[in-house]
Amino acid sequence: MRISALEGCRVALWGWGRESRAAYRAFRAAFPKQPLTLFCTIAEATEVQALADPVLSIETEVSVPRLAAFDVVIKSPGISPYSPLAVAATAAGAHFIGGTQLWFAAHADTDGVVPGAVCVTGTKGKSTTTALLAHLLRAAGHCTALAGNIGLPLLELLTPQPAPEYWAIELSSYQTADVAGSGARPALALVLNVFPEHLDWHGGEQRYINDKLSLVTVARPPIALLNAADPRLASLVLPQSDLRWFNQRDGWHVRGQVVYRGEQAVLDTALIPLPGAHNGSNVCAVLATLEALGLNAVALAPAACNFRPLPNRLQFLGERDGILWVNDSISTTPHATLAALDCFLGRRRVAVLVGGYDRGVNWECFAARITRKVPLDIVTMGANGPHIQALLAPLAAGRFGLHAAVDLPHAVALARTALGAQGGVLLLSPGAPSFGAYQDYVERGRHFAILAGFDPEVISSISGLGIA
């Protein structure tokens, strides 16, 4: 559905997050005088009233009859379509769409393909990969948009003039189904990996996987690029796409710490400001994408060395009193925490802070790995902290210190004490969302920076968003 199709319709917005605010602005730009209803919280209503929009109605209670009363409801991506309320409303006739769906429908050619659109998804690494892709496309002299889940909703760039040559678009699992439902197809879809995450939103592991992979299984991009080292991805068959791979020995892959194209050594990952083996894989994904787009990836690879890392993603805040403070607040799965630990274990003493909102993710994989490569200390916190603590307690004796904190300040204090005068790495890599304690992972990362004694404003901006 194109945004022009909303003219004269009864339209509502559900939610008032970043994506919904972008949808509001896009709707108002198209239809300045058309009535619109917003379902939001009481706290959000106060902010919205300041807009002084005479044809905007604000409702702080949402129900099945009210949702079903509209022709179209533009839903915030954070609201699950599998929630009882959304399911009941759909059964009653409510029609939900998302902002991502509106953008893709607006930009599709007659064959359904959005020219120059490269969509990146995966359980972890997608923000860094998308930003690095935009960085290298710009290094090649191509006007490129960096947008999507990374921090700039696509609807903020609905009708840019002039249009960029390429769109580097990060998509969450909440948004991939939006693309699939739009009827449009990205020119290239890149899937980095798939681990269980957001199980509360999707209602189970298999549905999460299906929704995530709908970007390639349902949207049918002309080119699909997948990680050959991921078992779930390696088994995919996509007959309607030109299927390509990275992390294969005859293509882009890492050996030791060097990026190779087949047998050709291309780039030493030690020169790139992205620590960890998983980031070597992300670099390969980007270079394989450039190659699939017809660009000289080997020649462009050295430009990765001046990439500016993103905040909250294995971000080195700085060193104070012998302690290196590392902010990996984006980490919302145990797999991500393990990848973060791999950057430091065996090199420096590490105290890691884990735990947060409990959405039912299994931490047994973390427990199994942690006994083979152990940090100095683990501090648990948050709603799932007691669960992680109980899982690790039988394994800790004689191997690593294990502490329980009531919140992030307490966790930081415990970790500092554990590291002591010898210092080491104090790593925030929670492996869980921030809900309940913070608005989002960004706010959690900012609080961590404050506790570490660093200016949160300096460390929290993402460079390169938008068109350049």
From Swiss-Prot:
Originating gene: murD2
One Pfam assignment: Mur_ligase_M
Main localisation: cytoplasm
Assigned GO CC terms: cytoplasm
Bilayer-crossing regions: none
HAMAP family assigned: MurD, MurD2_subfam
Keyword Ligase on entry: yes
Protein's recorded name: UDP-N-acetylmuramoyl-L-alanine--L-glutamate ligase
Catalytic activity reported: UDP-N-acetyl-alpha-D-muramoyl-L-alanine + L-glutamate + ATP = UDP-N-acetyl-alpha-D-muramoyl-L-alanyl-L-glutamate + ADP + phosphate + H(+)
